[in-house]
Amino acid sequence: MADVKKIATRESYGNTLKELAAEGHDDLVVLDADLAAATKTGMFRKVHPDRHFDCGIAEGNMMGVAAGLSTMGYVPFVSSFAMFAAGRAFEQVRNSIGYPHLNVKIGATHGGISVGEDGASHQCCEDFALMRSIPGMTVICPADDVEARAAVRAAYAMEGPVYLRFGRLAVPVFHDADNYHFEIGKGEQITEGNDIAIIATGLMVNEARIAAEQLAAEGIHARVINIHTIKPLDEEIILKAAKECGKVITAEEHNVIGGLCEAVCAVLSEKLPTPVRRVGVQDVFGCSGPAWDLLAKYGLDAATICKTAHEMLNK
């Protein structure tokens, strides 16, 4: 594939918050936990310091503050690393935001193994599982800059709690901003193919694209499906792919337990039993190292997707 621009989706998050405010959305407020430089909400703070609230390293309290602001008519985007937003503050997210179904948007950056050198303590590979278990919570993991920007806008426009996962790592931008339509709960078919389906989310979507190109050179035609919304899940696109391809690979930068794979398997087991193989973090903790090296170490790459496809097709 030709070289393309790379942007971290956390940058997309910060830029879009700033753009929304500039467009006159005066109900938009942003909260952070002493991490505005890392989550990129500092972009918003520079132009609207009166609408940016730094709650310090007290993520649970920050979720409560966001809940309170939402009851007063504001639309809070509450920001921290995924490990702290989904992990440390889970009780407050569940009880203060999820239970009353408040209009709070959680912008969780630094998700997954690709946090890199920060190591296992900061590499949150359990956030999908935690957040999708909360009734009424929408869970989104965009694949690139274009999709991330669209996801932030869609989250702002909808009513109800939303969890958005963004990455630290700069990843290829493969969507065309002028010809891209984002809809919460609707997956996107990226490539044609009926030999095998690769259902991916987040940065694994581009790895699936690369894998599909490599497989095509061997005469294997893989259908790549981008599931940016993990909840609510687009069952229709999954069932169609499973029916027409007969074999499915899921790919996610998350523990294979509790995330996209289990969501897909739940649909297929009930409605269309289909062979499925899981590409993801295999129920282990991460370690410290350069992001791309870690993705390769844990099998979160195109090479592993291709290997898995060969194993399924040759079985």
Predicted regions and their residues:
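Thiamine diphosphate
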Residues: 1-165, 170, 181, ...
